Regions:
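Acidic-basic catalytic patches of nuclease active cores, encompassing PD-(D/E)XK
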Residues: 66, 97-130
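Short nucleic-acid-contacting surface segments enriched for D/E, G, S/T with interspersed K/R
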Residues: 64-75
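Nucleic-acid nuclease catalytic cores
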Residues: 165-175, 182-214, 236
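Conserved catalytic cores of phosphodiester-cleaving nucleases, focusing on short active-site segments
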Residues: 35, 141-171, 184
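Short aromatic-glycine-enriched beta-strand elements
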Residues: 43-47
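Short, charged beta-turn/beta-strand-edge "cap" motif at the junction between a beta-strand
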Residues: 39, 79-84
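Domain-level recognition of nuclease-like catalytic cores that cleave nucleotide substrates
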Residues: 201-258
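OB-fold/S1-family single-stranded nucleic acid-binding modules
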Residues: 85-97
């Protein structure tokens, strides 16, 4: 029955994408500066060649990113201000061939909030944003949504890794992410409405699945939480230097690899 439902869900997603013709986009209201990646001294710092000068830039995404951050690839930087900043730039995106991929882990939350406010996510059209960064127990979740007298706890996860058309999360071991889905699953088991929304920050994915090779614990925790009632959804977007374009929902496969 579960496999039959998954096939039906994939068919519905494909039909929705086929008949959804209106572009949904969020404008980017700042300028980018293009450079080429040199190296990454630590998780939060990149060195970039910008017009012949070597500059240091803050990296918002602390993930592994080895498939993306290769010497010489094109990088988009944003100029930052603030007297306490250690760098004057932040690394916002990277080109994988002609595909632009966001490296800003805050963008999925901002884009999700925009889509929720505009009621553009079909499966969340009836929900309003009630609170952000809402605590529950020892955890904090991105959104609390409200529909009449019903509440939902929503956690958003950023996805940047795609291999052979399959989006995968995480790209490195995430104990925090594992605890998040375990807690959401326990809440769902008690009758509390919970959802984890994976936002794929690139347009070249056809399917989502856990990254079993690098973090099987997260994959098993997600699958178990899903079986307990945690709702799992996946959307994806396309980034250009001028906007973020919503591409709709993606199908997923959470079945553990044998």
């Amino acid at each position: 029955m579960r496999k039959w439902l998954e096939k039906l869900f994939i068919l519905i997603v494909k039909l929705n994408r086929l008949y959804s013709k209106k572009k949904i986009e969020l404008k980017i209201n700042y300028n980018f500066f293009e450079g080429s990646f040199i190296d990454r001294p630590n998780r939060f710092l990149t060195r970039v060649n910008y017009k012949g000068a070597i500059i240091e830039s803050h990296l918002p995404d602390p993930g592994r990113l080895k498939e993306l951050l290769k010497p010489g690839v094109r990088i988009l930087l944003k100029k930052e201000s603030g007297e306490h900043r250690k760098t004057k730039f932040s690394t916002q995106a990277v080109y994988d061939g002609d595909t632009l991929i966001s490296l800003n882990t805050l963008l999925p939350n901002q884009f999700t909030a925009y889509l929720l406010t505009k009621r553009k996510i079909d499966f969340l059209k009836e929900w309003d944003i009630h609170k952000k960064e809402i605590p529950y127990g020892n955890h904090r979740f991105d959104f609390q949504l409200k529909r009449e007298n019903e509440y939902m706890y929503l956690e958003v996860k950023s996805v940047t890794l795609v291999e052979k058309g399959i989006a995968k999360f995480p790209d490195a071991v995430t104990e925090r992410g594992e605890k998040h889905v375990e807690h959401l699953g326990a809440m769902a088991e008690k009758g509390i409405c919970t959802m984890v929304l994976f936002v794929v920050q690139r347009p070249d994915a056809k399917l989502f699945q856990p990254q079993w090779e690098r973090d099987p614990k997260f994959g098993f925790s997600l699958h178990k939480a899903w079986q307990k009632g945690l709702e799992v959804r996946v959307i994806h977007m396309k980034m250009t230097p001028n906007n973020l374009l919503y591409l709709g929902e993606l199908p997923f496969n959470l079945n553990p690899k044998s």
